[in-house]
Amino acid sequence: MASVEKLPMLAEGYEKLTAELKALREERPRIVDAIEEARAHGDLSENAEYHAAKERQGQVEATIADLEDRVSRAQIIDPTTLSGDKIIFGATVTLLDDDEKPVKYQIVGPYEADAKKGMISYNSPLGKALIGRKVDEEIEVTVPSGDKFYLVQKIEFI
């Protein structure tokens, strides 16, 4: 039997997933009602409301299945319980870029990543380059605009 790959995530990411799942499950009956109402309007071949409701139902069901899968595989990680001198999932890292300007990122799961909030996926090019690194190590990352160089300045588990 194949093992199920766990999805590491922070508690906040798990809460966001479960909230989205709950909202979609609550939307299900409204979609069924919309389909029934549209059906009552007669000819389904030219019934835009019916086709829109059926399309939305398909989208919602697919998203629910995806979210249920992710929730079932979730492995919640609390960064405050971690320690060490290497960058791992959940670590908050301060880097110095080419201009010696400090930038701070937290290593998170792919579904939690939000670069604007300083949260990068361990699967991203920068995330992959950081995992396993220590303070004072230099890393090189190839991004669409070219190669970027960083120096690991600090590793925290907060």
Swiss-Prot record:
Q: Cross-referenced Pfam families, in alphabetical order?
A: GreA_GreB, GreA_GreB_N
- Coiled coil (residue ranges): 5-75
A GO molecular function annotation here is:
RNA polymerase binding
- Keyword tags: Coiled coil, DNA-binding, Transcription, Transcription regulation
Which GO BP terms apply? DNA-templated transcription elongation; regulation of DNA-templated transcription elongation
- Explain the purpose of this protein: Necessary for efficient RNA polymerase transcription elongation past template-encoded arresting sites. The arresting sites in DNA have the property of trapping a certain fraction of elongating RNA polymerases that pass through, resulting in locked ternary complexes. Cleavage of the nascent transcript by cleavage factors such as GreA or GreB allows the resumption of elongation from the new 3'terminus. GreA releases sequences of 2 to 3 nucleotides.
Q: PANTHER family per the record?
A: TRANSCRIPTION ELONGATION FACTOR GREA
User: What protein family does this chain belong to?
Assistant: Belongs to the GreA/GreB family.
Q: What is this protein called?
A: Transcription elongation factor GreA
Q: Which organism is it from?
A: Novosphingobium aromaticivorans (strain ATCC 700278 / DSM 12444 / CCUG 56034 / CIP 105152 / NBRC 16084 / F199)
Highest classification ranks of the organism: Bacteria, Pseudomonadati, Pseudomonadota, Alphaproteobacteria, Sphingomonadales
